[in-house]
Amino acid sequence: MSKNKLSKGQQRRVNANHQRRLKTSAEKADYDDNLFGEPAEGIVISRFGMHADVESADGEVHRCNIRRTIRSLVTGDRVVWRPGKAAAEGVNVKGIVEAVHERTSVLTRPDFYDGVKPIAANIDQIVIVSAILPELSLNIIDRYLVGCETLQVEPLIVLNKIDLLDDEGMDFVNEQMDIYRNIGYRVLMVSSHTQDGLKPLEEALTGRISIFAGQSGVGKSSLLNALLGLQNEILTNDVSNVSGLGQHTTTAARLYHFPHGGDVIDSPGVREFGLWHLEPEQITQGFVEFHDYLGHCKYRDCKHDADPGCAIREAVENGAIAETRFENYHRILESMAQVKTRKNFSDTDD
């Protein structure tokens, strides 16, 4: 049996009525002020849909609803919340988040549908964790560094699993890390297994809100477990004996407190920074050693590749800029172009 097709006017009225019902339902779903106590300050420990775990000043964690007027709430946000009155009927959670304080920083990741998606707030340090196994990738480190420079959050490079190096291997890795030390980045060499180098890392984390970034298999979770202590063990799967790669088991961003002071937000959203949403000029600015040479190329539209009179390429040839970094710069630009091409094709594919 065929069905009568709605006219455009009828369809508009159906859609309008549907939106009106949604709005009415949302308004009814909000909460009576009389059910909650006096406002208090707190910090979001984790976010789960329309609920958030909020830590109060006394260190207690409260599962809270979120006012529908709050458009964005992520781990690390400092908030005003109100505790639920225990005697009141209909209060199934411990409180409600009323407002969010202005953020000092926000870590985002690109999203194919929404542009960028916030995943953590108020961080002041990104710890880039790499390791000699399964592979020491300077390209991945450089991608993270571009992300840090774009977000204007201070990076700290941590090389894990140094207990697996012999003297010759240690010399080689130190030469690689000198590339970053020479342009002003902090580098720490550690082992979560033997705990070598953990003391300087603890000192670098004290008094800061950090987030650890690293690919699977670099020992990020094991390193966090060693720093946090057994009372705050983060789930970890063994590295596969076949692939040498680890399984990332964190499912939601969560804030933890270090025993020595400082906080860390562990999030699955920062295993690898997506950079495809950035413009090529932002990638160029993300390489700090390029800054002194920008604006000195022969041509204003210089691509810093085979262009004649390129000041950056000349600096590479003179040894002022590491050739590895220059090559990774172009690899990043190439990968961005490929992803944007796939995205544009997907957007136009009906």
From Swiss-Prot:
Any one GO BP annotation for this protein: ribosomal small subunit biogenesis
A Pfam family the protein falls into: RsgA_GTPase
Domain of life of the organism encoding this protein: Bacteria
Keywords: Cytoplasm, GTP-binding, Hydrolase, Metal-binding, Nucleotide-binding, Ribosome biogenesis, RNA-binding, rRNA-binding, Zinc
GO MF term (any one): metal ion binding
CC cofactor: Zn(2+)
Positions contributing to Zn(2+) binding: C297, C302, H304, C310
Cofactor annotation comment: Binds 1 zinc ion per subunit.
First-tier enzyme category under EC: hydrolase
Keyword Zinc: yes
One Gene Ontology cellular component annotation held by this UniProt entry: cytoplasm
Residue ranges, compositional bias (Polar residues): 1-17
EC number: 3.6.1.-
Function as written in the Swiss-Prot or TrEMBL entry: One of several proteins that assist in the late maturation steps of the functional core of the 30S ribosomal subunit. Helps release RbfA from mature subunits. May play a role in the assembly of ribosomal proteins into the subunit. Circularly permuted GTPase that catalyzes slow GTP hydrolysis, GTPase activity is stimulated by the 30S ribosomal subunit.
Protein family per UniProt: Belongs to the TRAFAC class YlqF/YawG GTPase family. RsgA subfamily.
Protein name per its UniProtKB record: Small ribosomal subunit biogenesis GTPase RsgA
